[in-house]
Amino acid sequence: ASLNENMYTFLIVGLDKVAYHTDTIMVGRFDVETHEINVVSIPRDTLMNITGSTKKINELFLRGMNNTDGDQDAKLQGGIDRMLEGITDILGFTPDVYAAVDLEAFVQLVDAIGGVDYDVPVDMHYSDPTQDLYINLDAGMQHLTGEQALAVMRFRSGYASADIGRIGTQQDFLMSIASQFLTLGSIPHLTEFIDIFTEYVETNMTTENLAFFARQFLLCKSEDIHFY
């Protein structure tokens, strides 16, 4: 349940449906009265106090899937449930809402809004055929497609601080998207956005919930959105 009627906590994970690792993990709080959003990134290599060989938080999702019987939907829910347990162990509370965002969904969501303008901080060149991952972006301001935006979110080999460097870029990139939405004062193609979300994203939010949070988000100011 929500801490109070105006405040909601949330968990967002980026889900790699090849290895089922969650290399992007963000927990936040949205106050719909003050319209302030605070988001904390949890590093993928955070160690957990759990039994077995799995120790990193980004492997919890797969562990939950493997320990769940049933069809793929049941296994995905098992992964989410195990992830929520791990987050609760770390933070002491269970987020009100969650969203496990498939990588393809992220591509489609960015394309649905017509791409995004972003100042890529470093040259990003990386290839890994085993993951079907090919990144080829030069540093500088540019208009990114969904595939290019995903490359920015996934790239980490070029940072001196590896995943911590990637987290900083992820936060900066998401802030850039948020600022562009708020400058427009609307979310282009909101219906399409929600359709993609409901089809590709594992979440406990209803369509009505998504529309509510979208409306509330548009009442925020950029300076009231904080990443840590």
Name each model-derived stretch.
Residues 1-228:
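Non-catalytic, solvent-exposed segments at the cell envelope interface
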